[in-house]
Regions:
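N-terminal leader/linker segments that precede catalytic domains of diphosphate-processing enzymes
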Residues: 1-267
Length: 267
């Protein structure tokens, strides 16, 4: 296998200092059916200035303090904080990861996993509604904490029940910026278009996981180890229904925490 971090913008920690405490983060594998047999996954290319710059990754980011707000317990559909925390193996605050991954997905690629309170999946109905949600996305990217207010104003529930918990990775201690990341998987809504933000991400592709791994081996796509391993876990499925049924059937207590370790070689 090619070296995953080669060519990717990362910062190594001082080995003489205590390791950085990892920050909570959440990431989502957005998948869709192809016209022929198989599935595609959405990857974004991180901007050179960002952490993991140059690498193709899944949409996601840090869990913000606001993601733990009590008001989200009334906005999230199908998953309670107790259920989310139990799945993640933590005492409380688990729902914040589900909220964060929906928020980050909307911020980074413009896909909003939500339901209308009147019933049915959220998809913009016309150009006016599209423009309104582009404005919400821009405000979120500018740092405004408008997600809860947006859901209230637009009469939406966050579709937390459409996210399947997939994996748990912690950045190695050798790296300066570390994340305690929960990976989720969800089917992309048919009526929404995924578009990278042009700031933190500079390119995006829908690609079969098998093809993404092939292009990594050929040196055409830069990727980091968590991306590679999660891509491997979704290979070989005929459609998203089969894939999501398989991942939803996983007992969350069987999902191991993965924290790669690096060792210095003599010479």
């Amino acid at each position: 296998m090619k070296e995953p971090l080669k060519g990717v913008n990362t910062q190594m920690a001082d080995p003489n200092e205590a390791p950085t405490v990892p920050q909570p983060a959440a990431t989502v594998l957005l998948v869709r059916d192809t016209q022929e047999d198989g599935i595609e996954v959405f990857l974004i290319e991180r901007a050179a200035k960002t952490n993991f710059g140059g690498a193709y990754v899944f949409p996601g980011g840090k869990v913000d303090l606001e993601d733990s707000s009590d008001e989200f317990s009334e906005i999230c559909q199908g998953v309670s904080d107790e259920e989310a925390s139990s799945a993640l193996g933590i005492e409380k605050g688990g729902l914040a990861y589900w909220v964060a991954v929906i928020r980050e997905c909307f911020e980074e690629v413009g896909i909003l996993l939500a339901y209308r309170k009147e019933g049915g999946n959220f998809d913009p109905e016309d150009e006016s509604e599209k423009e309104r949600f582009v404005n919400y996305r821009n405000r979120l990217n500018d740092g405004e904490k408008v997600l809860a207010n947006m859901c209230e104003s637009e009469e939406l529930f966050l579709a937390t029940d459409r996210l399947a918990y997939l994996a748990h990775w912690i950045t190695p201690k050798i790296e300066k910026r570390r994340y305690d990341t929960r990976f989720f998987i969800a089917q992309a809504p048919e009526g929404q278009e995924a578009i990278h933000d042009g700031s933190e991400s500079v390119n995006s592709i829908w690609i079969k996981p098998e093809e993404a791994l092939k292009q990594f081996e050929e040196g055409k796509l830069l990727m980091i180890m968590p991306t590679i391993k999660n891509l491997e876990s979704i290979c070989g499925f005929s459609n998203t229904k089969e894939l999501l049924e398989s991942k939803n059937a996983i007992n969350p207590y069987d999902i191991a925490t993965i924290e790669p370790k690096f060792f210095m070689e003599n010479g």
